[in-house]
From Swiss-Prot:
GO terms for biological process: DNA integration; DNA transposition. It comes from the Eukaryota. This is Transposable element Tcb1 transposase. It is found in: Nucleus. Transmembrane segments: none annotated. Probably essential for transposable element Tcb1 transposition. The insertion of Tcb1 is the main cause of spontaneous mutations. Its main location: nucleus.
Length: 273
């Protein structure tokens, strides 16, 4: 019976004790209680945990991630100078998204089979776009309504570019992910017209983008701070964004070699970053 309980859990870590109870029950054996099942799993080192959420990465993209990481593994502060890191993120005003649980051995949080695949952006109260470089925190722009290629082009033209020229001059490289609105022909024409150099970027690679940890920094700075409406929430986000010191940026950029090595070691699967 114990062997069947462990097998059922390892076949699908998302199975609950009730699911396992149903799958191992047979006419010739007593039905184990849910409490007994949980105890057997804990003794075997399979504890209930919330799964880390990471993007589902295809084989093709895993190979591209490893190749990119190898190409940039030796890059240091000099190579990453004048690079602009950008992304969008949502911030919930009330509570969090749905909670899911899995059972996994201790120390296996980032193993692929114990991750929860995600799709970027679900719903949310406030959506923002932001960027930064090695020398300056960039603007934080609120996105109202649907973020499409036209809204994105407007952000590039009227928010990103003026800041970049004022802080980085005319020689800089822009990073963006491969979201369809970022790579649309409409936006590609803008980059060509403005002669913007783009950093080649592997798909499904938020763990290689240090701005992802900047969003986490924002969350930490606003932990426990309540907002009564979306306008107030954005005002809080913007104030917290402007208060982030450059030491945080420097620490994130110094992590790039480790991020690249982690991707290589994970064979392209999502990493802890």
């Amino acid at each position: 019976m114990d062997r069947n309980i462990l097998r059922a859990c390892r076949e699908d870590p998302r199975r609950t004790s009730t699911d396992i109870q149903l799958s191992v029950t047979s006419p010739n054996e007593p039905v184990p209680s849910r409490r007994t099942i949980r105890r057997r799993l804990q003794v075997a080192g399979l504890h209930g945990r919330r799964p880390v959420k990471k993007p589902l990465v295809s084989l093709k993209n895993r190979k591209a991630r490893v190749e990119w990481a190898k190409q940039h593994l030796s890059w240091g502060p000099r190579e990453w100078a004048n690079h602009i890191w950008s992304d969008e993120s949502k911030f919930n005003m009330f509570g969090t998204d749905g909670i899911q649980w899995i059972r996994r051995p201790i120390g296996s949080r980032y193993a692929p089979q114990y991750q929860c695949p995600t799709v970027k952006h679900g719903g949310g109260s406030v959506m923002v776009w932001g960027c930064f470089s090695d020398t300056s925190m960039g603007p934080l722009k609120r996105i109202v309504g649907t973020m499409d290629r036209y809204v994105y082009e407007d952000i590039l033209e009227n928010t990103m570019r003026p800041w970049a020229r004022a802080n980085l001059g005319r020689s800089w490289v822009f990073q963006q992910d491969n979201d369809p609105k970022h790579t649309s022909g409409h936006v590609a024409n803008w980059f060509r017209r403005r002669r913007v150099n783009l950093l080649e970027w592997p798909s499904q690679s938020p763990d290689l983008n240090p701005i992802e940890h900047m969003w986490e920094e924002l969350e930490r700075r606003l932990k426990g701070v309540r907002a009564s409406n979306a306008n107030q929430k954005f005002a809080q986000l913007e104030a917290a964004w402007k208060s982030i010191p450059m030491t945080v940026v420097q620490t994130l950029l110094e992590s790039m070699p480790r991020r690249c090595k982690a991707v290589i070691d994970a064979k392209g699967y999502p990493t802890k970053y």
